[in-house]
Swiss-Prot record:
Domain BCNT-C, residue spans: 177-256
Keyword Repressor annotated: no
GO cellular component: nucleus
This protein's encoding gene: swc5
UniProt-recorded name of the protein: SWR1-complex protein 5
């Protein structure tokens, strides 16, 4: 009980006293709350304002220099893109099929470098900005078409236990004669000719296309440099060990 009484007395004590104050606190508080009161935050000196103005101008100037005007940017970018893009046309025979490829790639890409390094069967044509835009539009259309086809529900497959009143299953299972197939294939490939490539060459073409698509050429270059550096260090250490062993052998021979 005594502890509760002491606690209540402490809670009832005032937080501050104004008995010994030399100014009228209530009057000053009322004056500060008055609507026409001039008391408040101190005004900013003129010298400080003058110091802030050049700083803001400098910041604006730096931002203008960092971000150039937009009209020149796209034009320069488009010119650079047009001058570095090339069109690759390639025709080859793989797995019994004649394949014709035509694509626009950057000149410094892995696929373009491989094509320019040792492939004389195709052609490289500098492209313009309009052709790049057209090829990009075709790519987007093909992508949207593929996405549309992916979300379609596949049709129900015909079962041999289903009724067949129209004879469709017999027609689908009918074998075509080899002469008709050969004649049709020969007519289609009569005007298309190209070199025959093996699986290794086809894999190399697919790999460079994948490298350009994923954008990992820089990582592969750094990895190859690191690998060469490791092999070089190992070779150096092996040479040092061989030299030490030779010195030991010479010392033993001199001692004998």
């Amino acid at each position: 009980m005594e502890s509760l009484t002491i606690r209540r007395q402490e809670e009832r004590k005032p937080l501050a006293k104004i008995d010994g104050a030399t100014i009228d606190v209530d009057a000053i508080w009322a004056q500060m709350n008055a609507p026409d009161s001039k008391l408040g935050l101190a005004p900013i000196p003129d010298a400080q304002k003058q110091d802030e103005t050049p700083a803001s101008d400098t910041e604006v100037r730096d931002q203008e220099n960092a971000n150039p005007t937009e009209p020149n940017g796209p034009a320069e970018k488009g010119f650079q893109q047009t001058s570095e893009m090339v069109k690759i046309k390639r025709t080859y025979k793989f797995a019994g099929e004649m394949i014709t490829e035509e694509k626009i790639v950057p000149r410094d890409s892995a696929e373009a470098k491989l094509f320019l390094s040792g492939n004389g069967d195709g052609e490289v044509i500098p492209v313009t900005e309009d052709e790049v835009a057209n090829m990009t539009g075709k790519g987007n259309e093909n992508t949207s078409t593929n996405n549309t086809l992916r979300i379609r529900r596949p049709l129900r497959k015909i079962s041999r236990f289903d009724p067949n009143p129209s004879g469709m299953i017999k027609k689908s299972w009918g074998k075509q004669s080899l002469t008709e197939t050969g004649a049709r294939t020969g007519a289609g490939q009569e005007n298309i000719r190209g070199p025959k490539i093996n699986t290794v060459e086809k894999s190399r073409l697919d790999w460079v296309a994948y490298v350009d698509q994923e954008g990992i050429s820089d990582e592969l270059r750094m990895h190859s440099k690191a690998k060469e550096g490791f092999l070089g260090r190992m070779d150096f250490l092996n040479r040092v060990d061989a030299k030490k062993e030779e010195e030991r052998r010479n010392a033993r021979l001199r001692g004998v």
